[in-house]
């Protein structure tokens, strides 16, 4: 049995997000995945939460992480499914199956990019979706999730 993590949120990053900082910096900026994870841990801690940060380029592994979040009774999910946002009904279904409050994040404004990026399956399984704020979107997502959970910043 998985160890409970009731004071934890899952921060899930999908394909190619391990390349942040080097992949098309004119679109995605110079911050790395390690920078994103540090920002998420810091923001989560300000609400008395822990951030369990995961990244995978494989759809099935992302689904396994979502299922694990349910088994461990995590409080919420922040997801940037990358390109899978636009293609993965399986990720959509996994998010709906676990019924954990979820916020979708995208570093870029997906609605200002190629038309195939305008639709997001994962957004339909989330209570909120943020895009275009760069990595600051992760901070905003955690703040929004905390508000949804009724949590206030710790002094």
Curated annotation (Swiss-Prot):
Name this protein carries in UniProt: 3-dehydroquinate dehydratase 1
Query: Could you tell me one molecular function GO term of this UniProt entry?
Result: 3-dehydroquinate dehydratase activity
Family as reported in the entry's similarity comment: Belongs to the type-II 3-dehydroquinase family.
A Pfam family of this chain: DHquinase_II
Organism in which the protein naturally occurs: Bradyrhizobium diazoefficiens (strain JCM 10833 / BCRC 13528 / IAM 13628 / NBRC 14792 / USDA 110)
**Signal peptide interval:** none
In short, the EC number is: 4.2.1.10
Site Transition state stabilizer — annotated at: 23
Which pathway is this protein assigned to? Metabolic intermediate biosynthesis; chorismate biosynthesis; chorismate from D-erythrose 4-phosphate and phosphoenolpyruvate: step 3/7
Task: List the catalytic residues.
Answer: 28, 106
Q: Which terms does the UniProt entry file under GO BP? A: amino acid biosynthetic process; aromatic amino acid family biosynthetic process; chorismate biosynthetic process; quinate catabolic process
Report which superkingdom the organism of origin falls in.
Answer: Bacteria
Q: Which PROSITE patterns match?
A: DEHYDROQUINASE_II
Question: What UniProt keywords apply to this chain's record, in alphabetical order?
Answer: Amino-acid biosynthesis, Aromatic amino acid biosynthesis, Lyase
Query: What is the annotated quaternary arrangement, including any partners?
Result: Homododecamer.
């Amino acid at each position: 049995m998985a160890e409970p993590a009731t004071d934890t949120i899952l921060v899930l990053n999908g394909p190619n997000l391990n390349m942040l900082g080097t992949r098309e910096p004119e679109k995605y900026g110079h911050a790395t995945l390690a920078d994103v994870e540090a920002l998420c841990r810091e923001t989560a801690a300000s609400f008395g939460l822990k951030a369990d940060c995961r990244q995978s380029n494989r759809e099935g592994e992302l689904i396994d992480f979502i299922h694990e979040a349910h088994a461990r009774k995590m409080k919420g999910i922040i997801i940037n499914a990358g390109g899978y946002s636009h293609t993965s009904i399986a990720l959509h279904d996994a998010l709906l199956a676990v019924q954990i409050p979820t916020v979708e994040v995208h570093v870029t404004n997906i609605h200002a990019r190629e038309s195939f990026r305008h639709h997001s399956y994962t957004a339909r399984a989330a209570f909120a979706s943020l895009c275009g704020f760069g990595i600051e979107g992760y901070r905003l997502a955690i703040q929004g999730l905390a508000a949804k959970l009724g949590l206030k910043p710790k002094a």
